[in-house]
Amino acid sequence: MNANVSKLLNEQINKEFYSAYLYLDFANYYAAVGLDGFENWYRVQAQEERDHAMLFYQYLQNNGEGVTFEAIAKPEWERGDHMTPLKKALEHEKLVTASIDAIYAAAYEAKDFRAMQMLDWFVKEQGEEEKNAADLITKMELFGGDSKGLCMLNSELKARVYTAPSLVL
């Protein structure tokens, strides 16, 4: 495997675990303010991010590459209103998308077709992640502070269940 692609994949493991930490912090915020549906949404999101990290880990292991673990940074964000985590999540997903795209570009340059094939799944996944984050913001904006709308959305988000990724390495 190309050394740069391996390095970037190793770094992505840390970024995915950071994403899980960030989303658990959002879940913790929503639990503290009594929005258990939002808490559930971000707890499930944290599970997804953890699994993304493990997919990168497994890909590197399957290809004879060592994995280097770095410290996971503490999530830093300013608590504000209930919209703050939603906006921060969209901003964060855009950063993750840029990171995946950079790994894909490096794999393309190195003609690492197996890595590109694996990354195809993540490119599609990131499109879904950004759309989901943007959709939550849109729904919150539609309510315009209406508590009934917030309760309805909270109930909707409470129904989300975790589904393991479909990528097979």
Where on the chain are the PLM-derived regions?
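Iron-associated oxidoreductase/ferritin-like identity signal
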Residues: 1-169
